[in-house]
Amino acid sequence: MRDPFLDFWEESSLTKYNIREYGSKMSGFDADNKELKLSYPKYPVVFKNKKSKLSLLTKLRKSVRNFGNSYLSLSQIMQVLTQLSSKEKDLEHRTYPSAGASYCVETFVLSFGEKQSENKVLYYDAEHNGVQEISNHDLNNNRIEKLCNISFSGTPSALILFVGFPDRITIKYSSRGYRFMLIEAGAMLQQIALGIAQSKKISGCPVGGLLDDELLKILKLEQENSLLITGYIIGASVKKP
C-alpha cells in the first residue's frame, strides 16, 4: 500500500509543468489581509524580553536576496555549513536535533564562481566538517532563478539544498517519521540562518519553491529514495557606501 505522505509530496512538488499555476496562486494572494495570530478575549500577560547572546543574534536574522557582485570563497561558505557539523566527529550528536539520532536529512551545495570550473556540486560531510565534490554544473543566474522560483539581484555564491532520505527514519517511526524528517530540516535551516546572522559579509534567504526533480537530477539523486525538502541561497553582502 502506498504511503499517503508520498501522495502529498507528489501533489506539492513543483515541476516545469505546474510552476506557472503555482506562480499565479502566489500573485493572487492578498498579503495585506493575512492572519498572523490567534485572538482570545483575555489580554496576554506581558514579560520583558531579557537580552542574551541568542536573543541578540536572532534579532540579526533576516532574509536577503540582494547580493554583491563578488563571490564568497569556499572557506566563507564553510563558515555557514559548519553550523551543521557533528560534535567531536560523532555523527549521532550534531548541532541540531534529530528523532532517534537518525539524521535523515543530508546537505548538498551548488557552488557558483567566476570560472566554469568553480561551479560545483558538493556534498557536506558533517563528520569531518568538509565538502566532497560530486560533479560540475553549468547553471547561470537566469537558470538558478527558474530552479528556485525566486528573483534576486547581484551574484549568488551557493545554493544549499536539504535532501531527506525517509527510509532512515520510517523504518523506526513508520509514517510518523516523515514529520520528524521535516522538523529536522527546519532545525537545519535555522542553524544556517543563525550562522549567516553572525556575519556582516554573508547574506542569504530560505528557498521553498524549488523544482524538485530537476535539482535531484543535478545532485544525481533521481534514482534514490530521496526527497528535496528546502534550500537556502547565499551570497556576498552588498557593501554599504
Residue ranges with predicted function:
Residues M1-L159, P166, K172, A185, ...:
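N-terminal accessory segments that position/regulate proteins before the catalytic core
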Residues R176-E184:
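Short pre-catalytic strand/loop immediately N-terminal to key active-site residues, enriched for Gly-Thr
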